[in-house]
Structures are given as structure tokens and as C-alpha cells.
Regions:
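Conserved HGGG/HGGXW glycine-rich cap/lid loop of the alpha/beta-hydrolase fold
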Residues: 2-40, 62-63
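Active-site signature of alpha/beta-hydrolase-fold catalytic machinery across serine-
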Residues: 18, 79-83
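Active-site loop/oxyanion-hole signature of alpha/beta-hydrolase fold enzymes
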Residues: 32-66, 82, 106-110
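Gly/Ala-rich beta-loop-alpha elbow adjacent to hydrolase catalytic centers
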Residues: 68-73, 77
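Flexible "cap/lid" loop of the alpha/beta hydrolase fold
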Residues: 82, 86-88, 92-126, 150-151, ...
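Active-site nucleophile elbow and catalytic-triad environment of alpha/beta-hydrolase enzymes
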Residues: 142-161
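Short beta-strand/loop motif that positions the catalytic acidic residue
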Residues: 164, 170-172
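Conserved loop-alpha-helix segment in the C-terminal half of the alpha/beta-hydrolase fold
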Residues: 177-204, 208, 216-224
Length: 228
């Protein structure tokens, strides 16, 4: 199966290299999606540009792909399901959840000179970054790509109710499946409360398992995709 890999904030497509290699060895065709503004040098990219890049990958896939979104990019994966509900086999959210209609895509941190730079490690102390040593943290911060303001502040627009019929799996790294279910039951993740086929998978890692547990993440993704 084609497995589209959509990276979260501050990350380029190469963050998936080890996961992609493992997926290929398991018989799948991984496709890291090149997002405008995350590795191409552009600071003027918009949320719509990134959605268009994901949709282009969906349309180019052989058969129905599985779309994997990490962290904030869970919303990109979900926007793809909204735009192509009949063309996507499954959506997988890794370490995050989709934003609701009308919400900003990623208004988490302050913009500086039109971009949202990596804020340093203080906001991620605890389970998020517990499995990243000092060397890994330095490398991550040095490679982090400032997110264009037009992406970070873009407003999420969802319109097709058929998105709720697309199967969804949630990979739970720095939180547990039980916590995710509690948040959904509490109304904190309204989009997932309406998904008809929703499953949860535990992964013992921090927020960036593509860095710290790539083989394990690849196995979970392959299992979510089912027989190739």
C-alpha cells in the first residue's frame, strides 16, 4: 500500500527516512510528502498550499493510500480525508489530533518576522522529549525549520461529513490510549468523537517516534495498513 507520511511542525520530509526504509522492507510504498514551507526555503507558504501538496500525493497514489499525519499535521491528514473521503483507505494520527473546523492550524507559539520558529525545549519537557538525549535535542533544534505564518495561522475548513466514514487509527506515543479516549469523551477532540471506525495503538516513546523508535513506528503503521 502507498503510505503517505506528513511531517509535523519544524520538520522536513527527511525526518521519515528511517521509518520509510522500514516500511519498504515490510512491503509497503512510503511517500514522505514535501510540504511547502518546510524544507523548500519558502516563508510565504500557506495552509492551503500544504493541503494541496497532500492532496496531490493522494491523487498520485496507486490505489487508495493510507495518510499518516504527525502532531499538528494530523490536521493536514484530516483535511485530506475531508477533501478526498472516497480516495483514502485510512488515516493515522501520530502524537496528535485534528483541529476542528474554524480553528487555527497551529497557533501554538509566537510568530517572529512572519514565521513560527522552534521555541526551544522548555515547552516540551516531560513525556514529549524524555527519550531525546542532549545530542538529539541539539540536532533537532539545529535542523528545525521555522513554520511560515500563513501555515501556522491558517484557518481549518472542514465541510464533508463523509470524512467520518474514513477509518482512523491513533498512535499514542507520549500519551496513552486511555488518555486519548478520556479527552474524546470529555469533548476535547470533537472530530474524533464522530469517527465511525476508530482504533488506538500504544507506542512507548516521546512525541517524535520517527527519531527515537522508527522501526517500532513502522511496524505499527504497517499493521494499521493491513495486508499489502
Amino acid at each position: 500500500m502507498d503510505i503517505l507520511l506528513v511531517a509535523g511542525l519544524w520538520l522536513g520530509g527527511s525526518v521519515w527516512d528511517d521509518v520509510a526504509a522500514a516500511l519498504r522492507s515490510l512491503g509497503h510504498r512510503p511517500v514522505p510528502v514535501a510540504l511547502p514551507g518546510q524544507g523548500d526555503g519558502s516563508t510565504s507558504a500557506t495552509l492551503e498550499d500544504q493541503v494541496a501538496a497532500v492532496l496531490a500525493a493522494v491523487d498520485a497514489a496507486s490505489g487508495k493510500p493510507m495518510v499518516v499525519g504527525h502532531s499538528a499535521a494530523c490536521t493536514l491528514a484530516w483535511l485530506a480525508a475531508d477533501a478526498r473521503p472516497d480516495k483514502i483507505a485510512k488515516v493515522v494520527f501520530v502524537g496528535g489530533f485534528p483541529a476542528a473546523d474554524g480553528k487555527p492550524y497551529a497557533g501554538f507559539f509566537e510568530l517572529r518576522d512572519g514565521v513560527m520558529p522552534f521555541p526551544g525545549w522548555d515547552p516540551f519537557e516531560g513525556p514529549d522529549a524524555a527519550d531525546l538525549d542532549e545530542e538529539a535535542r541539539r540536532a533537532f533544534a539545529a535542523a528545525a525549520i521555522p513554520v511560515p505564518g500563513g501555515v501556522a495561522t491558517g484557518i481549518v475548513r472542514l465541510s464533508d461529513e463523509r470524512r467520518f466514514a474514513v477509518p482512523v487509527a491513533v498512535v499514542c506515543p507520549e500519551f496513552t490510549p486511555a488518555q486519548a479516549k478520556e479527552w474524546i469523551d470529555a469533548g476535547d477532540i470533537p472530530e474524533l468523537a464522530r469517527v465511525g471506525d476508530l482504533s488506538f495503538v500504544d507506542l512507548d516513546s516521546g512525541h517524535w517516534p520517527m527519531h527515537t523508535k522508527p522501526a517500532e513506528l513502522a511496524r505499527l503503521l504497517a499493521a494499521a495498513a493491513g495486508p499489502n
